[in-house]
C-alpha cells in the first residue's frame, strides 16, 4: 500500500489574534471556566513557591508587549503531570502573556526538581518555555535555569551543549524578591546583543 507524503503546512506569525484565542483576560474578553493561565501551583502545592517574571525584547532592544509564552516543567519532585487537571494542586503546563503597558510577564509556580534525561543523567532544575510573538513564524523554544543552582547548572548535560559561557548565561534567571516573595527574573532577547539561546527541539 503506497502512502502519499503531504507537504508541511506553512507556519505563520502569531499576529494580533493570539490574545483573543489564548490570553482572553489580556485581550479584555471574558475568561473560560477552564482557563490555563499563569498560576501553575496552588497554595497547597508542595515545594518552594516562586514567582517568575521578565520582559521580552526584540532585536532593537524594544519591549515586545504582545508576546505569548507557554511553560512545561516538572513538579518539586522532578515529575511531570501527564494531563492538565484543575483539581490537582500543581500542573506541569502553564501560559502567560506580556502586558500591553509594562511589557512584563509573570508566572506563579514551584521550583522544579531534578529530571533525568533519556540516558539517565540528571539535568539541572529548569523550565521549558515556548515563545510566540509577532514576526516569529515558528515559535521559539528555550529553557529557564536558576542562578542559585550553580553546581547543578555546571553539570547539566543540556546546558553544557552550549560551548560559550556567556551564551549559557542567557538561560539563567536571576534570584530576587518581589513584595517579600522569592522570585526569579528572566528576560528574553529575541535577537541582538545577548540574544537568548533557543533550541531546535
Give the residues covered by each predicted segment.
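Beta-strand-dominated extracellular/periplasmic modules and repeats
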Residues: 1-201
